[in-house]
Regions:
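Divalent cation-coordinating acidic motifs and surrounding scaffolds
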Residues: 1-190
Length: 190
């Protein structure tokens, strides 16, 4: 979800509504039970709107997980919307604020039909763009700027794996999101 919100993103309420409608319709077509979203702007407000729209557009019941962060602001975050008919979140959402806040979150879920549990980690690693310095400077190896930061973010997820599996009581762990790296780049092979 790119630039969804008010105050930071669309320039007017008309643009906001167009973007909201387009995004909601696209999500409804995916027909998922859980949406792990990145690039959410205006925080809880955007998640609440999308959950309400999904409920309206699909006839299924959707909710979002309130992570307790502020509603408005010029920031992006990650978050979860889930179908309450199919899954239930369990445990308290864990935040991993290594390098960039509000963009790496971990939540346990239980599938209602089977009782199976799993852990879903939604992430949005630092972008390759910009002009980093030191280890974050573009090294000319095709991985772009801030590769060291992305590696640090990946290592942070791995180093907290045991904590997450203990917290949520399960070892089925799925990492999703925008890692801003290709399959053979350092953040993925770490």
């Amino acid at each position: 979800v790119d630039n969804f919100g008010t105050g930071y993103g669309p320039d007017s309420s008309t643009d906001h509504q167009k973007q909201r409608t387009k995004t909601s319709q696209a999500l409804a077509k995916i027909n998922a039970d859980i949406y792990a979203l990145v690039e959410i702007q205006t925080g809880q407000g955007a998640l609440a709107e999308l959950a309400a729209d999904l409920t309206k557009n699909t006839g299924r019941n959707f909710a979002y997980i309130n992570d307790g962060s502020v509603t408005d602001g010029s920031f992006t975050k990650s978050g979860y919307i889930y179908c309450t008919d199919k899954v239930t979140p369990h445990g308290n959402m864990q935040h991993n604020d290594t390098y960039v806040e509000n963009r790496k979150k971990v939540q346990g879920f239980t599938e209602k039909a089977s009782g199976e549990q799993f852990i879903l980690s939604v992430n949005h690693f630092k972008a390759k763009s910009g002009s980093g310095s030191g280890a974050n400077k573009d090294q000319g190896d095709g991985q772009g700027s801030y590769n060291a930061a992305r590696v640090q973010e990946a290592k942070s997820i791995l180093s907290n794996y045991s904590s997450y599996t203990s917290t949520f009581g399960d070892e089925d762990f799925l990492i999703v999101g925008d890692l801003n790296a290709y399959g053979k780049e350092d953040p993925i092979t770490t």
